[in-house]
Amino acid sequence: MGIGGSDMYRQQILDHYKNPRNYGEIEDATFTHVGENQSCGDTIKMDVVLDDEETIEAVAFRGDGCAISQASASMLSERLPGTSIEELREMDRDDITDMLGVEISPMRVKCAVLAEKVAQDGAEIYLGERDLDTTQTEGDDPDIPE
């Protein structure tokens, strides 16, 4: 009996959670930013290296939390290299859902988008468009991409 599409994606999420890609840090990152989901305790710190044209060259992350938040960070760290900083800023919740391959329950959306939000906020801070110490995904956050 074959694995259904949804089961395959669930296995992929578990694989990224148990064997995260690009886990660690980049000492000479262009920017580093940290975020947390206070409602469940997920944390992600992300390092991003940009080239001279502001295209993402490398991403590393470290953190702690549920399978969805950590798998999302791992998958995003593989997806972002080769992406422009503008393309990163345009990503939204649907991009993360598509990347994960499963529907995310309303209670887990903040877990799923934490890494994306950390990367986007880090980019905005780098560009001088935002002054923020830590990304938060607590409460009704209007900045969580729809």
Where is each model-derived feature located?
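Short beta-strand elements
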Residues: D42-D52
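Alpha-helical support elements that line or immediately flank enzyme active sites
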Residues: S72-G82
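Basic, gly/Ser/Thr/Pro-rich low-complexity segments located predominantly at protein N termini
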Residues: A29, M46, I68-Q70, E87
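Short, thiol/selenol-centered motifs that function as redox-active sites or metal-ligating centers
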Residues: C40, G63-A71
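C-terminal binding/interaction regions
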Residues: M1-E27, T32-H33, E57, T83-E146
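Short Gly/Pro-enriched turn/cap motifs at secondary-structure boundaries
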Residues: V34-S39
